[in-house]
C-alpha cells in the first residue's frame, strides 16, 4: 500500500534505483534516480492512454531498471486542497503496488509541471511543441529529485 504524501524513505536501502511517475490522463512522465547518488534524470513519457498498454510499458521498465521502490507524484492546490486528479494518482499508485509488489511512495508534486516548463524554457526549448514531448518526464524527474532531497539525511 502506498505511503502517505509525507514521502518518508524509511526502510529503503542505501543503494538502489527508483522510478518516479508523473501520472496524467493522457501521458505519464517517468524518471529514474539512484539512492546512492541522490540524483534523478528524466527517462521517457508514456503516451498510451489504455491501461493495459501503459502497464505493459511500465512492466518492461521495471524489468529493465529493477527499482527498489517507486515514487508517484500527488497533485495538490497551493492552498492545500486536494487536486481533482489526486484520487486517480492514488489509484495508480495502488495499482503499481498491487501488480508489481514494489513499495510505492506518494510525494507532493505541486508546481512540478510549472517548474518543468520553466526548466525546459530556460534550457532553450522554446514553444509548446518543442517542450511537450519531454515535459512529463522532466516533471517526473523533479518529483523524484524532491523525494530524494527530502530524504537526503534519512538513515538507510
Swiss-Prot record:
Protein name per UniProt: Putative pre-16S rRNA nuclease
The molecular function GO annotations come to:
nuclease activity
Q: What class of enzyme is it?
A: hydrolase
Q: Which keywords fit this entry according to its UniProt record? A: Cytoplasm, Hydrolase, Nuclease, Ribosome biogenesis
Q: Which family does it belong to?
A: Belongs to the YqgF nuclease family.
So what EC number does this one have?
3.1.-.-
Sorted alphabetically, the Gene Ontology cellular component annotations on this record are:
cytosol
Query: Where does the UniProt annotation locate this protein?
Result: Cytoplasm
Q: Sorted alphabetically, which Pfam families does this protein's record hold?
A: RuvX
Task: Provide the function of this protein.
Answer: Could be a nuclease involved in processing of the 5'-end of pre-16S rRNA.
Which GO terms are recorded in the biological process aspect for this UniProt protein? rRNA 5'-end processing
Amino acid at each position: 500500500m502506498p505511503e502517505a504524501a509525507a514521502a518518508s524513505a524509511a526502510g529503503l536501502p542505501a543503494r538502489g534505483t527508483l522510478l518516479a511517475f508523473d501520472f496524467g490522463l493522457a501521458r505519464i512522465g517517468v524518471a529514474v534516480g539512484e539512492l546512492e547518488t541522490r540524483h534523478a534524470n528524466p527517462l521517457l513519457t508514456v503516451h498510451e492512454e489504455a491501461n493495459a498498454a501503459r502497464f505493459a510499458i511500465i512492466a518492461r521498465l521495471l524489468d529493465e531498471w529493477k527499482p527498489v521502490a517507486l515514487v508517484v507524484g500527488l497533485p495538490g492546490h497551493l492552498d492545500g486542497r486536494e487536486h481533482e486528479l489526486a484520487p486517480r494518482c492514488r489509484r495508480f499508485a495502488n495499482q503499481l503496488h498491487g501488480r508489481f509488489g514494489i513499495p510505492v511512495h506518494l510525494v507532493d508534486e505541486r508546481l512540478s509541471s510549472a517548474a518543468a516548463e520553466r526548466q525546459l524554457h530556460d534550457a532553450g526549448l522554446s514553444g509548446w511543441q518543442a517542450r511537450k514531448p519531454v515535459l512529463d518526464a522532466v516533471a517526473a524527474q523533479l518529483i523524484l529529485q524532491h523525494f530524494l532531497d527530502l530524504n537526503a539525511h534519512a538513515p538507510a
